[in-house]
């Protein structure tokens, strides 16, 4: 249940933040939040993370759907009971669904978080991307700290 609740919260926060950006900012506009470091910049992304594999709409929808189906199946297994694992899978699932909604509805994802330092700009991303990244990091942590000790 923890994974499902966390996934739902992630999807809601992701979709609300994207809606706020899309309805209050012009495409490609930027609002500097921390000068020289962080801005909100509204862009569309038809690819994956960092703009890779542009125009792969249905490929990414299929990958996200398969990932969600796999996670839902795994969550029914006894070995998925560890809380850290459930949090990790909930975040990954929520992020996958958040971006999948955009891809199905519009064929692109709204990205708006932009970090930069001098001439280096990290690619724009969104809340769903954060959820997937943190979820995968927690999954790795679970594998290293829990699975290796055999305490899952």
Swiss-Prot record:
Where, by residue number, does the polypeptide cross the bilayer? Answer: 55-75, 87-107, 125-145
Major enzyme class: hydrolase
The protein's superkingdom reads Bacteria
Determine if Cell membrane is one of this entry's keywords.
Answer: yes
Give UniProt keywords alphabetically. Aspartyl protease, Cell membrane, Hydrolase, Membrane, Protease, Transmembrane, Transmembrane helix
Alphabetical list of InterPro entries matching this protein: Peptidase_A8
A Pfam short name: Peptidase_A8
The pathway that the record names for this protein is: Protein modification; lipoprotein biosynthesis (signal peptide cleavage)
Which GO terms of the cellular component aspect does the record hold?
plasma membrane
Q: Which reaction does it catalyse?
A: Release of signal peptides from bacterial membrane prolipoproteins. Hydrolyzes -Xaa-Yaa-Zaa-|-(S,diacylglyceryl)Cys-, in which Xaa is hydrophobic (preferably Leu), and Yaa (Ala or Ser) and Zaa (Gly or Ala) have small, neutral side chains
Its BP terms in the Gene Ontology are: proteolysis
EC numbers on record: 3.4.23.36
Per the record, the major location class is membrane
Task: Identify a single GO molecular function assigned to this protein.
Answer: aspartic-type endopeptidase activity
Q: Where in the cell is it found?
A: Cell membrane
Q: Which residues form the active site?
A: 111, 129
Q: How does it sit in the membrane?
A: Multi-pass membrane protein
Q: What's the stated role of this polypeptide?
A: This protein specifically catalyzes the removal of signal peptides from prolipoproteins.
Can you tell me which family this protein belongs to? Belongs to the peptidase A8 family.
Return the HAMAP family for the record. Answer: LspA
Q: What is this protein called?
A: Lipoprotein signal peptidase
Protein species of origin: Symbiobacterium thermophilum (strain DSM 24528 / JCM 14929 / IAM 14863 / T)
Give the gene name.
lspA
């Amino acid at each position: 249940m923890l994974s499902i609740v966390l996934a739902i919260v992630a999807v809601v926060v992701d979709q609300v933040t994207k809606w706020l950006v899309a309805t209050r900012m012009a495409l490609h506009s930027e609002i500097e939040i921390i000068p020289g470091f962080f801005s909100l910049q509204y862009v569309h992304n038809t690819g994956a993370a960092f703009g890779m594999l542009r125009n792969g709409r249905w490929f990414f929808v299929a990958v996200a759907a398969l990932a969600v189906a796999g996670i839902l199946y795994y969550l029914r297994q006894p070995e998925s009971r560890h809380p850290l694992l459930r949090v990790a899978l909930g975040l990954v699932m929520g992020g996958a669904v958040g971006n999948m909604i955009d891809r199905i509805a519009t064929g692109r994802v709204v990205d708006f978080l932009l970090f930069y330092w001098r001439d280096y700009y990290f690619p724009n991303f969104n809340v769903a991307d954060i959820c997937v990244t943190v979820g995968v990091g927690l999954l790795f942590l679970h594998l290293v700290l829990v699975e290796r000790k055999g305490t899952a």
